[in-house]
């Protein structure tokens, strides 16, 4: 992406940013997810652009609509003063931030961080939510969504999101194009370094094959070259003794070391995994994110990517 080329935005004249005077408030950009927040903070470092997540301490995406709806009166001044929102709505219609912000401020710009408004720009790679693939999983749960939601867990997608956000930030704030461009390159290098380091460690640890009790991490496994031997997706309370026995047998027969999940499951499931000599690894989808002192961590996305990969590598080496 050539950041020197400032993209033409609809109604650009409305949003031209004057030079900051002594009493002028710095530009404000809003986000609603950890991924959007971390990427936007990284891209605007060293500029006067302020980035604020709504709310500051984060919310699960599924709860964000209710949170904003109940506080619309108190949030309206924030929406009115903001120049842009970094949203994921085109990929995840459940992201409500831009809709509420626009209700308060018709001039606010929607920076789409996943599926861009431009008809010529590619978006992030999206995958379908996995379903159970094992022979014994005939009564497994159906996925809640067709498109798997946590696409920021792919380093490739995180980089693409950075590209998309940076391009629109440059269009909105051309005076800071050089700094944003430098920040983008720094962000890309750090993410590529992280992926390269862990790909080597995963190969060395023998953790190139995993079994999944959730479909939430399809982007992570695809991006890191991890082969998912099988999926079995079923609420804990619905597991039968036959399910537990079948899981243990499958893990043992296929010498699988690592089983990934999105939460700590029931004791019975944990015992079924350990009986096969495998390790259960609970991963973080980044929703709502990393909260430190009642605020999302600026580098929360990077922390989550590293934490997840560390957990898989450590489990495989035990």
Across the structure, where does each feature detected by a protein language model lie?
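Positively charged n-region of N-terminal signal peptides that target proteins for export
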Residues: 1-5
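Extracytoplasmic metal-acquisition and chelation regions
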Residues: 21-318
């Amino acid at each position: 992406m050539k950041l020197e080329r400032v993209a033409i935005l609809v109604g650009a004249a409305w949003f031209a940013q004057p030079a900051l005077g002594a009493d002028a408030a710095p530009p404000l950009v809003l986000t609603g997810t950890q991924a959007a927040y971390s990427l936007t903070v990284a891209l605007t470092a060293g500029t006067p652009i302020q980035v604020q997540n709504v709310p500051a301490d984060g919310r699960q995406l599924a709860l964000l609509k209710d949170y904003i709806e109940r506080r619309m009166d108190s949030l309206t001044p924030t929406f009115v003063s903001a120049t842009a929102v970094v949203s994921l709505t085109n990929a995840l219609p459940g992201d409500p931030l831009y809709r509420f912000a626009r209700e308060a401020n018709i001039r606010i710009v929607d920076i789409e961080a996943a599926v861009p408004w431009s008809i010529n720009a590619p978006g992030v790679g999206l995958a379908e939510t996995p379903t159970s693939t094992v022979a014994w999983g005939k009564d497994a749960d159906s996925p809640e969504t067709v498109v798997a939601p946590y696409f920021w867990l792919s380093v490739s997608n995180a980089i693409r999101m950075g590209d998309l956000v940076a391009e629109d930030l440059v269009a909105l704030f051309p005076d800071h194009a050089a700094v944003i461009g430098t920040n983008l390159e720094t962000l890309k290098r750090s993410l590529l370094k992280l992926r390269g380091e862990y790909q080597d460690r995963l190969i060395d640890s023998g953790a190139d094959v995993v079994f999944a009790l959730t479909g939430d991490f399809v982007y992570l496994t695809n991006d890191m070259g991890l082969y998912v031997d099988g999926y079995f997706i079923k609420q804990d309370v619905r597991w039968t003794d036959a399910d537990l026995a079948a899981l243990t047998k499958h893990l043992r027969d296929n010498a699988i070391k690592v089983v990934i999940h999105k939460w700590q499951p029931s004791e019975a499931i944990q015992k079924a995994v350990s009986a096969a000599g495998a390790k259960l690894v609970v991963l973080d989808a980044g929703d709502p994110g990393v909260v430190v002192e009642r605020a999302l961590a600026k580098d929360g996305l990077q922390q989550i990517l590293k934490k997840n990969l560390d957990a898989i590598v450590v489990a495989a080496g035990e």
